[in-house]
UniProtKB/Swiss-Prot annotation:
One of its GO terms (cellular component) is cytoplasm. It is found in: Cytoplasm. Pfam families: Ferrochelatase. The keyword Metal-binding applies. It is an enzyme of class 4 (lyase). It catalyses: heme b + 2 H(+) = protoporphyrin IX + Fe(2+). It comes from Campylobacter jejuni subsp. jejuni serotype O:23/36 (strain 81-176). This is Ferrochelatase. Fe cation binds at H185, E262. Keywords: Cytoplasm, Heme biosynthesis, Iron, Lyase, Metal-binding, Porphyrin biosynthesis. GO terms for biological process: heme biosynthetic process.
C-alpha cells in the first residue's frame, strides 16, 4: 500500500470543537513557545477561554462549521476514484481526525509506504514542522515499519503555479480588477527572527506569480492576515490594505490550499465591513481537477525535501 496523508491544522466541524481547536493549537510548542509544558498549558487555557466565544460567533456566520474537513475529504474521495495506486486520507493537528485514529485504520508493514503531504506551499515550523513531528511520533508510537516520505515546499512547482494563475485569471474575467492582493497568514516577527523560512518563501512565491501575471494587473500587493495578540506580526495587515485602497481588487489567499475560516469568514465576510474598496475573493485550490493533477504529479516524482528548524 502507498498511503498519502494530507496534513493540516484542521477546522472545527461544530461549535463545540472550537474550544478543542484553540486548546490544542495553543498547547502546540511551535505556536506558543513556552518551554515549560505546565506553564504553556495554563496560558493556553487562559487564551482559549478568552477567545472561544468570539470564535463560535464567527463560525455561526459560516453555518456553524469550517468547510476545511469536507473539502479535504472531497479531495481524498476524488483522488481515490481517479486512480488505484495510492490511497488518500487526511489528518488534522488540532481537531479530528487525529493521527492516532487515521493510522489505526490501516495495516501497514515494511513493504508499504506512507507519504506525508502537508497542505502548506511554504515551509514554517509552526505548520509543516509541527505537523510532521506529530505524525512521525505517532508512526513510531504505533511501531509502523512502513517507509515514510515527505512532500514539502511546493510553491516553486510549475503545475501548482499554472493552476494558481488559471484560477486568478478566471476570476478576473468575471471581476475586472487591476490590483491583485496576495493575502498570506501572518506570523509573529519573533518566529521569523529565529530563522523560520516562511516569509522568504512567501516573498519568493509572490515574485514568481507577479512575473506570470504582470501583463494582467497594474499593481501587486503582499499583505498578511489573521494577526492575533499584541506582539509584532508580519506586515502590512490585509485589513489595513483594504481599508486604504480606493480601487477594485482581487484577493488570492496565497498560503492556503483549502478554504477555511480564514478565507471564507475573515477574507470573505469580516474584511468586507472594513474595506474601502470593492473586492472579490479567489477560492483556494480545494478539490479542483488542477490541484489533483499537481498532487498526483508530485507523489509520482516526489519533491520531498527535509527542512529542519
Amino acid at each position: 500500500m502507498k498511503l498519502v496523508l494530507f496534513l493540516n491544522m484542521g477546522g472545527a466541524t461544530n461549535l463545540q470543537d472550537c474550544e478543542v481547536f484553540l486548546k490544542n493549537m495553543f498547547n502546540d510548542p511551535y505556536i506558543l513557545g513556552i518551554k515549560n509544558r505546565f506553564l504553556r498549558k495554563f496560558v493556553a487555557w487562559i487564551i482559549t477561554k478568552a477567545r472561544v466565544k468570539a470564535m463560535q460567533e464567527n463560525y455561526k456566520k459560516m453555518g456553524g462549521k469550517s468547510p476545511l474537513n469536507e473539502l479535504t475529504q472531497s479531495l481524498c474521495n476524488k483522488l481515490n476514484l481517479k486512480q488505484d495506486e495510492f490511497k488518500f486520507d487526511f489528518v488534522n493537528l488540532y481537531v479530528p481526525p487525529f493521527a492516532t485514529e487515521i493510522l489505526q485504520k490501516y495495516t501497514l508493514n515494511e513493504s508499504d509506504e506512507i507519504i506525508l503531504f502537508p497542505l502548506y506551499p511554504h515551509h514554517s515550523c509552526t505548520t509543516v514542522t509541527s505537523s510532521l513531528e506529530v505524525l512521525q511520533n505517532e508512526i513510531s508510537k504505533q511501531k509502523i515499519q512502513a517507509k515514510v516520505k515527505t512532500i514539502d515546499i511546493f510553491y516553486k512547482n510549475e503545475l501548482y503555479n499554472e493552476m494558481i494563475v488559471s484560477h486568478i485569471l478566471d476570476k478576473k474575467s468575471k471581476f475586472d480588477a487591476k490590483i491583485l492582493i496576495f493575502s498570506a497568514h501572518s506570523l509573529p516577527q519573533s518566529i521569523i527572527d529565529k530563522g523560520d523560512l516562511y516569509e522568504k518563501h512567501v516573498n519568493d512565491h509572490v515574485e514568481i506569480l507577479k512575473e506570470k501575471l504582470k501583463d494582467h494587473f497594474d499593481e501587486f500587493i503582499l499583505a498578511y492576515q489573521s494577526k492575533l495578540g499584541p506582539v509584532k506580526w508580519l506586515e502590512p495587515n490585509t485589513s489595513d490594505v483594504l481599508a486604504n485602497l480606493n480601487d477594485k481588487a482581487l484577493i488570492y489567499p496565497i498560503s492556503f490550499c483549502i478554504d477555511c475560516s480564514e478565507t471564507i469568514f475573515e477574507l470573505g465576510m469580516e474584511y468586507k465591513h472594513l474595506a474601502k474598496c470593492d473586492y472579490d475573493l479567489i477560492s483556494c485550490p480545494n478539490d479542483s481537477d488542477e490541484f489533483m493533477e499537481f498532487i498526483l504529479n508530485s507523489i509520482n516524482s516526489p519533491l520531498a525535501r527535509k527542512t529542519s528548524c
